[in-house]
Amino acid sequence: MPDLEKVRTLAKDLTKTYPRSPREMLGGYVIGARCADKCRAFLPGINGDYNYWPCSLAGLLFSFTGITPEQFKEVVATGANDEELAAWLKAQSKVQDQQAIIQWNNKMRDLRLSEMAPQVQAYMEDYIPKYVPSHRPVYVYFDVYDLEEKRL
């Protein structure tokens, strides 16, 4: 059952701050914590310029786990905290093999733009010059967000 008041207490105001890095884990998955932040902000409308869905980062997580954006949003809407959301993510993921999850996490951490889908590469071609400092090189996909949001 949705509990937007509880969601508001957990939500970061993304008009004033950044979501967590895609490198931060939730439930053993990179990208998970960032998805939670963006979804929690989306529900009460304090997501600013951040999209919960569609999002290429979230798409990677949802594709790997087999969880849909709507399923994730329904759980977040209950006011689930990080621990509860992590437990749900672990239980609902189609991937239960810990070694496969570790390998996927490492693949995501090392993912280069040239390895991304063509539409993501095209999007990043315009996005990076607008939002990433020109003197900072992007080595892997996660760098785009960590540079833009001043974590690197």
Predicted regions and their residues:
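Short coil/turn linker and secondary-structure boundary residues
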Residues: 2, 30, 53-56, 67, ...
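Polar/charged low-complexity regulatory segments
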Residues: 3-49, 110-152
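Broad hydrophobic/π-residue packing in well-ordered secondary structure
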Residues: 31-32, 61-65, 69, 93, ...
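Amphipathic alpha-helical packing elements
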Residues: 47-89
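Amphipathic protein-protein interaction modules
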Residues: 72, 76-129
